[in-house]
């Protein structure tokens, strides 16, 4: 069985601004319990105990999506006994999306990309993700990855 959606983070290796905001409630509740490193060894131990044999890391809102993807790619290459792929972040509304996609394609563990288009009404209004589905640039970005 494959764990098709999990996150890893090393707060010393990659910057996750949303994760480190102290005292801020998120759409999923209080982030305090997860404001710590969650690394591959812990994930493997927990996932294997549940019968998982492989996993897919999903991007988790790093300040620099490419930096996160490179970090995950390194984790994958250093842990050959645990098959893992990743879905990385790409800003599909950006004029630089083709460059981002080219860089991501150089990473052997990347099997897809995502850009979150909805979390909660308040967070979406603040981050403008609520406008993505009506954005011509975003729609062009979606089209570019389907070609």
Regions found by a protein language model. Give the residues of each.
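Helix-coil boundary/capping segments in enzymes
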Residues: 1-147
């Amino acid at each position: 069985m494959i764990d098709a959606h999990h996150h890893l983070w090393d707060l010393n290796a990659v910057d996750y601004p949303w994760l480190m905001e102290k005292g801020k409630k998120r759409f999923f509740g209080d982030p305090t319990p997860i404001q710590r490193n969650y690394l591959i060894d812990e994930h493997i131990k927990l996932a294997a105990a549940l019968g998982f044999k492989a996993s897919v890391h999903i991007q988790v809102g790093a300040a620099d999506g490419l930096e996160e993807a490179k970090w995950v790619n390194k984790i994958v290459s250093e842990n050959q006994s645990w098959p893992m792929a990743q879905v990385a972040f790409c800003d599909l509304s950006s004029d630089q999306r083709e460059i981002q996609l080219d860089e991501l394609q150089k990473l052997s563990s990347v099997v897809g990309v995502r850009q979150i288009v909805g979390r909660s009404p308040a967070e979406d209004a603040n981050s403008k993700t609520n406008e993505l589905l009506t954005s011509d640039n975003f729609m062009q970005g979606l089209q570019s990855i389907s070609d």
